[in-house]
A protein has these predicted regions:
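P-loop NTP-binding core
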Residues: 1-299
Length: 299
């Protein structure tokens, strides 16, 4: 009987050992997400709401950059600004305060055609329905309307065949405008800043999604929770991430958006990170989100 050498015993089985997987920012094993396949035709659109009642969590930044990344992959994308602050419109360089026709007119005036409100952006394949402060009066005007929760869905119907995705940037509330978005969407993406108070609000939001699904839109599903503004250097962020994964599991996107000074720069420039800094880590992260969203919706 030949004794094994010390070097052989250190290998612990050698060839048959599973290699230690590389971990992603979520703490789960990193996986390769395939790029979306090329399309041979476009439409009908899948409508996605970017939704969180807490402000400052990266909804608008994520809407712009997810839309731009999808357009890079050959998708036709329409972004809808549903926030009276008009940050989505401004972030794409559209002078929204000067416009006569916006999403407000679509909601309150059935004679307004959506084709009159769509603006081309500087990104090929990416269009926008803008908003401005006029939208703040929409909920008051709609409150007594029959089918008031379906107004946005009716307005979008004529262009459903023209786009692959329609992404709605919701305002930071769970009022009638947000309910309109959820009522016409197939999916919801919930961006959340990686900090404790953002985590606390997720239960209320998921409860609202459940109520809309039960009462207005049986097809509504949560596509995923997108962690944004993650600072891997801080213990707090890592602890919150661990808790989010513990509570929501596979609902959390593998793709994580880290904190960077690049995003304020793109807001001033009026263009997405994918064109402003195409080789940056942030641009690659949003391409990952786009690939993962397409993958999840195809299941």
């Amino acid at each position: 009987m030949v004794a094994s050498s010390p070097h052989e015993s250190d290998k612990g089985g050698g060839l048959f050992d599973d290699p230690t997987p590389e971990l992603g920012l979520t703490g789960r094993p990193r996986r390769q997400i395939p790029e979306p396949p090329q399309l041979d035709r476009h439409g009908p659109a899948t409508i996605v709401s970017m939704c969180n009642q807490k402000g400052g969590v990266g909804k608008t930044t994520s809407t712009i950059n997810l839309g731009a990344a999808l357009a890079e992959y050959g998708r036709r994308v329409l972004l809808v600004d549903l926030d009276p602050q008009g940050a989505l419109s401004a972030g794409l360089g559209i002078p929204h305060d000067e416009l006569d026709l916006t999403v407000f007119n679509l909601l309150v005036d059935p004679s307004t055609s959506i084709l009159e409100t769509i603006h081309r952006t500087a990104v090929s394949g990416l269009d926008l329905v803008p908003a401005n402060i006029d939208l703040s009066a929409a909920e008051i005007q709609l409150v007594n309307e029959v089918g008031r929760e379906q107004c946005l869905g009716r307005a979008l119907r004529p262009v459903m065949g023209e786009y692959d995705y329609i992404i709605i940037d919701c305002q930071p509330s769970l009022g009638l405008l947000t309910v309109n978005a959820l009522a016409c969407s197939q999916g919801v993406i919930i961006p959340m800043e990686c900090e404790y108070f953002s985590l606390r609000g997720l239960a209320l939001l998921t409860d609202t999604v459940d109520k809309v699904r039960d009462r207005l839109n049986f097809n509504l599903e949560i596509i995923g929770i997108l962690v944004t503004m993650f600072d891997r250097r801080t213990l707090h962020a890592r602890e919150v991430m661990e808790r989010v994964i513990e509570v929501f599991g596979d609902q959390v996107f593998d793709s994580v958006i880290t904190r960077t000074v690049r995003f304020p720069e793109t807001s001033v420039a009026g263009e997405p990170i994918t064109t402003w800094a195409p080789t940056s880590e942030a641009a690659e992260q949003y391409r990952g989100v786009a690939s993962e969203m397409v993958e999840r919706l195809s299941k």
